[in-house]
Amino acid sequence: LNIKVLKKTSDELRIEIEGEGHTFCNVLQRALLEDETVEMAGYNISHPLVANPVVYVRMKEGRKPEKKPETALREAAAKIKLQTKQFRTSLEKALKEWQQK
């Protein structure tokens, strides 16, 4: 997974994620928007066959605590990782219960 930083300020971050699509970016966007310090999060894929998604994050002005957009991205990635682990655990439990029927 290659990531290229396209723009970085104290309030904004724009990155390009090579080889990803709507599936990953949609999950990332949702996790970012659950952060109260994030004003806007979105992504754009200019052409689904030849373009990489560009993810954009803008933080709220006067946010407390002061958080950088890269910190919000790191926290969103950690949240996605935890949710994936919880999903796997729940799936394994459900499959085991199904087999015992």
Q: For each predicted feature, which ranges?
A:
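Protein-protein interaction/assembly regions in multi-subunit complexes
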Residues: 1-101
